[in-house]
Curated annotation (Swiss-Prot):
Region (Involved in ssDNA binding): 42-51
Organism in which the protein naturally occurs: African swine fever virus (isolate Tick/South Africa/Pretoriuskop Pr4/1996)
Annotated residues for binding of Mg(2+): D49, D51, D100
Protein name, entry field: Repair DNA polymerase X
GO biological process: double-strand break repair via nonhomologous end joining
Disulfide bonds: C81-C86
Cofactor: Mg(2+)
Cofactor detail note: In the presence of magnesium, pol X shows a strong preference for the ssDNA gaps having one and two nucleotides.
């Protein structure tokens, strides 16, 4: 367990330290492509872990980011890691914390931010309402009859409004 303040400090420390190895080179992950999600974004007082969403600029890089993740000046161990999710244990100020990393492509960003911020109860209500209209919403997009529905949106707030719901800031979601 860690406090919200500790979680925010960890994220600030990580922002300039995340990179991945690709074709023998170390590629820095830009701070603007690292988004705090989960209980940290909802500003819960106590956190079980730190969740970060990494926006990957090119599809060809997606399979390389998490399996080849590097954190400058941090000691960490990998619990499990794939193309879209990686669970790490990081050493920070003499304690060990769980860090969950997720990836999304730029066009998936609004959907992924909503999905990984949650909370689950909020997402269930939205998805149930959409299901009645034969839509499926997940972290990759909005689908109707298994076909991606293109929406001209770039933010989570625009997504919520486009779906016909009232936007609530993450800490006010139930």
């Amino acid at each position: 367990m860690l406090t919200l303040i500790q979680g925010k400090k960890i994220v600030n420390d990580l922002r300039s330290r995340l990179a991945f190895e690709y074709n023998g080179q170390l590629i820095k992950i830009l701070s603007k492509n690292i988004i705090a999600v989960g209980s940290l974004r909802r500003e819960e007082k106590m956190l079980n872990d730190v969740d970060l969403l990494i926006i990957v600029p090119e599809k060809k890089l997606l399979k390389h980011v998490l399996p080849n993740i590097r954190i400058k000046d941090f000691s960490f161990s990998v619990k499990v890691c794939g193309e879209r999710k990686c669970v790490l244990f990081i050493e920070w100020k003499k304690n060990t914390y769980q860090l969950d990393l997720f990836t999304a492509l730029a066009e998936e960003k609004p959907y992924a931010v909503l999905h990984f911020t949650g909370p689950v109860s909020y997402l269930i209500r939205i998805r149930a309402a959409l299901k009645k209209k034969n839509y499926k919403l997940n972290q990759y997009g909005l689908f109707k009859n298994q076909t991606l529905v293109p929406l001209k949106i770039t933010t989570e707030k625009e997504l919520i409004k486009e779906l016909g719901f009232t936007y609530r800031i993450p800490k006010k979601r139930l």
